[in-house]
Amino acid sequence: MQQIFLRLKQYKNLIIVVLFSFFFNNAIASYIFIPMDEGQTDHLKAYGIAFWTLEKGSTCDWLLNYKGGSFALPYIKEFEKECLIRGVKYEVITDGQMAKITAEIAEPTANMDVMRLEKAPKIAVYSPKSKLPWDDAVTLVLTYAEIPYTLIYDEEVMRGDLGLYDWLHLHHEDFTGQYGKFYASYKYAEWYVNDVQNAENNAKKLGFDKVSELKSAVAQ
């Protein structure tokens, strides 16, 4: 028994160092700070990381107007790994460093704020199903950022699906059913003729004689 106590005494300092290192490392790794200023390596992927953490059930602080609208995430090893995978610049900061940032943001003269994000919104984009992601700037950006979205069009709107989504993106739609501004230049182009035919077929499918009647109903 005495030998056991002697051995424990010999390793006492080592045990203290190991325990101290464990608690110290956890203390310093409290937040993942994602800057959104010119130093960020991939801004779109950074937005995707913020969205992804919300999907994982975590919260995310959006630091409005602080270094370009940065993000602060709870430190979780999986989150750090995902930043590395997606090529997003980040820093691991302590509670103390985060407190200094929030104090700076809270200054009366600072045009900044902290917005706590708690839920990943369900996103819908109003766009024809025939379009590919790279045909549309919005879907191209969302696809690159790895932010999930659903394409909806007239059929889904008429069915009442809008209530399924938290956020809807509309392009510069006029809902007149006039087939857009390209008529004069492209009315004989194959892709334009196909778009017109698809629009007319869709209107008939939904019980309308004219595309303009369908678009009017969708707008309501």
Predicted features, each with a name:
Residues 2-15:
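Bacterial N-terminal signal peptides that target proteins for export
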Residues 13-25:
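Bacterial N-terminal signal peptides
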Residues 23, 49-51, 180, 185:
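Hydrophobic alpha-helical segments
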Residues 29-137, 145-148:
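Hydrophobic targeting/anchoring helices
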Residues 31-32, 37, 41, 76-81, ...:
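Helical hinge/lid and interdomain linker segments adjacent to catalytic or ligand-binding clefts
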